[in-house]
Amino acid sequence: MKKYKFWGWEQADAKPITDTCKGIHKPADLYDALSHVWCADTCAPRLRDQWKPENMTLGQCSITAFLTQDLFGGKVYGILRPGGNYHCFNVIGNCRFDLTNEQFGDEVLSYDQSTEQFREVHFAKEEKRLRYEYLKTELKKYCER
């Protein structure tokens, strides 16, 4: 069995609620696909100059979490970070996982101190909505190849 670095991968057994992305049957499959799609253009602008392939999840959390919600359902939660931003992750039933926690290196995040996040709030920022749409389009292209 392949081991992953994202938090919660061992219990991330959620099933998709849609068949829009061929080959994605569990969150680990989505992580594998996104590993080919995440890029500087999908990274949050404030972190873009720090983005590199070796830290591919940097600045990708909210758009990835909402895209994951599109595919698997559930809710998106956020951990308040210094500076007032939220780091987003997914909760689907009893399954909790974070496809983008690798960006924090060895820092251990407290997932118990989190609040539900809503796409209407996050996507009120047009740049974030556009990054989400771009990520979704590129993922679909990758899955159709």
Cite the ranges covered by each PLM segment.
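A structural boundary/capping signal
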Residues: M1-R145
